[in-house]
Design a protein with these regions (language model features):
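Alpha/beta catalytic barrel-like cores
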Residues: 1-48, 59-61, 149, 153-159, ...
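Glycine-rich, proline-tolerant flexible connector loops at the mouths of alpha/beta enzymes
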Residues: 25-27, 57-70, 98-104, 145
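Glycine-rich anion/phosphate-binding loops
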Residues: 28-43, 66-81, 114-115
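Short acidic/polar active-site loop segments enriched in Thr and Asp
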Residues: 51-53
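Conserved, mostly hydrophobic/aromatic
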Residues: 55, 94, 136, 208
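Catalytic core of soluble alpha/beta enzymes
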Residues: 100, 104-171
Length: 248
């Protein structure tokens, strides 16, 4: 039994990251690569058991950036990737991430995220991507790491839901937030607060560090800590599961 087959036997659908990383785009900006040979790779991954794919675009706030050109170039690549996925019977996770790095305010984040989502969905529609067959993986609307004013949980939830309501079509079935470097507690509580709102979509999580970091810290590479680390991971997973129903 292959690893994908084992996952499927446990009702876990496997997926794969298919972009090839970033290249410089102008001053301080990045463009995600990976369209070359993508259709052939997707067909191979589907045959191996993958049922979804992921492509991450990076949008960097800063002095005079992001530019419209960079947002558009990344949105076009996201749309081309998403269409190729659907043509191969894979569900595309569409991930336009506005980074937390920097001193930008939460209002700056709202404006940049709004511009980004508008452009992404314009390109998805231009490329005839079926919006009912994607999952959106966006950032939350947050203060930059180095901003002197850090928005609280209530403000983050309100601004994020307002931004999504204005710019994400109702046909999109699900939104799975990235944690983007938030603490594990903040990522969970922001999700919990957002799920107190009535929205058109299922709001859930697609966290890396916010799920894994506490378990990795508990483990610390020591075999005697494995059971403890597993318990920590289950605890974080349960908390986020409850947050999807505003249950905390």
């Amino acid at each position: 039994m292959t690893f994908p087959e084992y996952l499927i036997s446990k009702d876990i659908l496997p997926g794969i990251k298919v972009d090839k990383g970033l290249e410089d785009f102008g001053s301080g900006e990045k463009l995600t690569l990976g369209l070359d040979g993508l259709s052939e790779r997707l067909a191979k991954y589907y045959a191996l058991g993958a049922r979804f794919a992921k492509w991450r675009a990076v949008i960097t706030p800063g002095n005079g950036i992001p530019t419209d050109d960079c947002i558009l170039a990344n949105a076009e690549n996201l749309a081309k990737y998403a269409l190729k996925c659907q043509q191969t019977n894979l569900v595309p996770i569409v991930e336009p991430e506005v980074l937390m790095d920097g001193s930008h305010t939460i209002d700056d984040s709202f404006e940049i995220t709004s511009r980004t989502l508008n452009t992404v969905f314009d390109q998805l529609e231009n490329h005839k991507v079926n919006l009912q067959g994607i999952i959106l993986k966006p950032n939350m609307v947050l203060s930059g790491y180095n901003c002197s004013y850090q928005a609280d949980i209530t403000e983050v939830a309100e601004k994020t839901v307002n931004c999504l309501s204005a710019h994400v079509p109702a046909e999109v079935p699900g939104i799975a937030f990235l944690s983007g470097g938030q603490s594990d507690e903040d990522a969970t509580m922001h999700l919990n607060e957002m799920n107190k709102y009535e929205t058109d979509w299922n709001l859930t999580f697609s966290y890396g560090r916010a799920l894994q970091q506490p378990a990795l810290k508990a483990w610390s590479g020591k075999s005697e800590n494995v059971e403890k680390a597993q318990g920590v991971f289950i605890e974080r997973a349960k908390a986020n599961s409850l947050a999807t129903a505003a249950g905390l």
